[in-house]
UniProtKB/Swiss-Prot annotation:
Its main location: membrane. It is a multi-pass membrane protein. Belongs to the UPF0316 family. This is UPF0316 protein USA300HOU_1913. InterPro entries: DUF2179, DUF5698, UPF0316. The keyword Methyltransferase does not apply. Coiled coil: none annotated. One of its GO terms (cellular component) is plasma membrane. The chain crosses the membrane at residues 8-28, 40-60, 66-86. Keywords: Cell membrane, Membrane, Transmembrane, Transmembrane helix. Disulfide bonds: none annotated. It is found in: Cell membrane.
Length: 200
């Protein structure tokens, strides 16, 4: 490690990279722990501590120059962003999407079921009259596709998405794992809806 300590700019780069790795693992472990993935979180914590032992000792012993302190702080902030981005790409867990729509004639529940989603729907009443509320459980990796599908089917729908803490009972989780969700283009969705309306 002497060649690193002797070169000030190489030291800055080393501090920056090591802190990115360390904080990335730290952020991912925290998120995974909160989501209940305890064994994956434990595996990530092993890598986190490994980086800490191997690299952070070098980092902390060379924070005597302003450029090293800036590299440490900048690496810390970038590490948080990188960790969150990785977790977003992994898209672990499920999302519940609540949809409120006034378009009864579109038969959105069956349209979404035909696309492979599990839908529970019921009637509700708002300020401007009756509404249809749908509750949809989907893996997080399909959340964006589901949101885009709903917006294409009903651009005026009111949508809320959140992550459930616990899931128990029902066919939702197993059904979604087995079910292959269809991926239609916006033009295809419009033709499907028009065909459904004309057939009624």
């Amino acid at each position: 490690m002497s060649f690193v300590t002797e070169n000030p700019w190489l030291m800055v780069l080393t501090i920056f990279i090591i802190n990115i790795c360390y904080v990335t693992f730290l952020t991912m472990r925290t998120i995974l722990t909160l989501k209940g993935y305890r064994y994956i979180a434990a595996s990530v914590s092993f890598l986190e501590v490994l980086v800490y032992i191997v690299g952070l000792g070098l980092v902390m012993s060379n924070l005597d120059h302003i450029q090293n302190i800036i590299a440490y702080a900048f690496g810390f902030s970038i590490g948080i962003i990188v960790g969150m981005k990785i977790e977003e790409k992994l898209a672990l867990g499920y999302t519940v999407v609540n949809v409120t729509s006034a378009e009864y004639e579109l038969d959105l529940p069956n349209e979404l079921r035909n696309l492979g989603y599990g839908v529970t729907h019921y009637a509700a009443f708002g300020r401007d009259g009756s509404r249809m509320v749908m509750q949809i459980l989907t893996p997080r990796k399909y959340e964006r596709k589901l949101m885009d599908t709903i917006k294409n089917l009903d651009p005026k729908a009111f949508i809320i998405a959140y992550e459930p803490r616990n899931i128990h009972g029902g066919f939702w989780t197993k059904g979604i794992r087995r079910r292959k969700l269809k991926d239609y283009e916006p033009e295809e969705l419009e033709s499907v809806v028009e065909h459904e309306i004309q057939s009624k």
